[in-house]
Amino acid sequence: MIDTLPAFWAVIPAAGVGARMAADRPKQYLELAGQTLLEHSLDCFLGHPALKGVVVSIAEDDPYWPGLRYASDPRIQCAAGGRERADSVLNALLVLHAQGAGDSDWVLVHDAARPNLARSDLDKLLSELADDPVGGLLAVPARDTLKRADSHGRVSATVDRSTIWQAYTPQMFRLGALHRALAECLVSDVVVTDEASAIEWSGQAPRLVEGRSDNIKVTRPEDLEWLRQRWAGKR
């Protein structure tokens, strides 16, 4: 690990609706320990000395963002949320370009509903990728036995988990490379579920940086309940 961490921009796509949560609002605005998941996710970055700024992609008709304490923070800019995650991230990168960010600047993209990022994991990612020619992402080696299912919901095969990792965020890439990769995927109608998959499609191999398994993304109600119990010291 290097002694000096590289400066970086953070991008948080926050325009999704989180349908699987079946909540009365988008999941990034659900509360955990007195503030929203989005605010917790922002907290992971705003106290970091290497941060240059943050762009949050927000849905056009979002009624919740203006009421957050970070809505008027000068370190945070907003971008228009898009139909898909890739659109939202690409719009955020355009905002960074407009602010004078260069193609060689590092950008870290983080899920709005992933509030439990440890500072040690963030520093590890920055340190290990500082001189990497491609960039990479936090990830966790698969622990459970993995099964491939057929169309009838029955096991068709057991997957060798020795080379399988779960992709987490932040995902860290150079602004120019990520912009080109996402733009090319959108033009080619390639579906990408994260930034690393866009970089992969462009022919590059992102590096996997092992992180903590408790850096979970809130996707279902039980995820939020687990975090509430953990943060309350009950787990």
UniProtKB/Swiss-Prot annotation:
It comes from the Bacteria. The gene is ispD. CDD domains: CDP-ME_synthetase. The record marks 20, 27 as: Transition state stabilizer. Keywords: Isoprene biosynthesis, Nucleotidyltransferase, Transferase. NCBIfam families: ispD (TIGR00453). It is an enzyme of class 2 (transferase). The keyword Transferase applies. GO terms for biological process: isopentenyl diphosphate biosynthetic process, methylerythritol 4-phosphate pathway. Catalyzes the formation of 4-diphosphocytidyl-2-C-methyl-D-erythritol from CTP and 2-C-methyl-D-erythritol 4-phosphate (MEP). Its EC number is 2.7.7.60. It catalyses: 2-C-methyl-D-erythritol 4-phosphate + CTP + H(+) = 4-CDP-2-C-methyl-D-erythritol + diphosphate. The record marks 161, 217 as: Positions MEP for the nucleophilic attack. GO terms for molecular function: 2-C-methyl-D-erythritol 4-phosphate cytidylyltransferase activity. Belongs to the IspD/TarI cytidylyltransferase family. IspD subfamily. This is 2-C-methyl-D-erythritol 4-phosphate cytidylyltransferase. Pathway: Isoprenoid biosynthesis; isopentenyl diphosphate biosynthesis via DXP pathway; isopentenyl diphosphate from 1-deoxy-D-xylulose 5-phosphate: step 2/6.
